[in-house]
Amino acid sequence: MLTIKPITKTRLLGYKRNYKHYPKTRLELIELIIERILSKGNCCDLNDIDVSAITDMTNLFNANNALRSFDGDISKWDVSNVETMYNMFTNSKFDGDISMWDVSNVTNMVDMFYGSSFNGDISKWDVSNVKTMKYMFTYSKFNGDISKWDVGNVTDMCGMFQSATFFNGDLSKWNVSNVHIMDDMFNGAIYFDNDLSGWNVDKVTNYDNMFNHSPLMTQLEKQPKFAHRNIV
């Protein structure tokens, strides 16, 4: 359970000045964010918080209602040392600019935008070290361009766009040759109708219900060429 220190008048006054903050742990960072939201509102600027020492951003904007309401500025955060962004924006209202984030060391993006309002530009993200994108955009409003993402190291895409009812991006050039799991990947993605027939799915072992309740369920010519068909 998350334990937050009492918010004192002295600590709140610190946020009214231009102090630089250097949290060393995820919990310290969460505490700082909550205090800032309570003192300056959910659209506040958090760029004066130096997050360069943080390696784990699990549940960062999902730990409580105040965090989920955040929609301020974190565009200049140095996230270059972060390794996991699990559940980072799950069910959050955040839709700010994070286009220039360096996510090159992140390996875990499970549930990152699950159920979130985010639809910003992340087209230039370097996701080449990510291993799992399981449920990354499930139930989200995301419909951005991620056509040039290097997903060559991803092994699990289970439910990645499940019930992502806004998404219809071009993924035709993705290198999914190391993916093993695609169960429910587009299940309920009611507008997704792009051509995936060129995907190399030789290593995929699980792909149950991959296109359930999506246009590709009946557009067989756009589906990847699985050795054993079981995609209903």
Question: Predicted segment positions?
Answer:
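Negatively charged
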Residues: 2-232
